[in-house]
């Protein structure tokens, strides 16, 4: 949900997609986290469903 912040275990990240949208989706047991690349000016904020 909006405003929700969670700590995540890096070892649990299982999906990385840096093509096109430049995002890495980290699917963990404690929620879905989206890591935004800061070097891509075309990257837009994304809120997981």
From Swiss-Prot:
It is found in: Secreted. One of its GO terms (molecular function) is toxin activity. The keyword Secreted applies. GO terms for cellular component: extracellular region. Keywords: Secreted, Toxin. Very potent toxin that exhibits a wide range of toxicities over various organisms and cells including brine shrimp larvae (Artemia salina), sea hare eggs (Aplysia kurodai), mice, and cultured mammalian cells. A SOR-containing fraction cleaves plasmid DNA in a bivalent metal ion dependent manner suggesting genotoxicity of SOR. Negative results: does not show any hemagglutinating or hemolytic activity against rabbit erythrocytes. Does not show antimicrobial activity against both Gram-positive and -negative bacteria. This is Soritesidine.
């Amino acid at each position: 949900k909006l405003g929700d912040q969670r700590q995540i275990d890096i070892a649990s990240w299982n999906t990385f997609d840096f093509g096109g949208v430049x995002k890495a989706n980290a699917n963990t047991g404690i929620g879905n986290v989206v890591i935004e690349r800061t070097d891509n000016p075309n990257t837009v904020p994304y809120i997981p469903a």
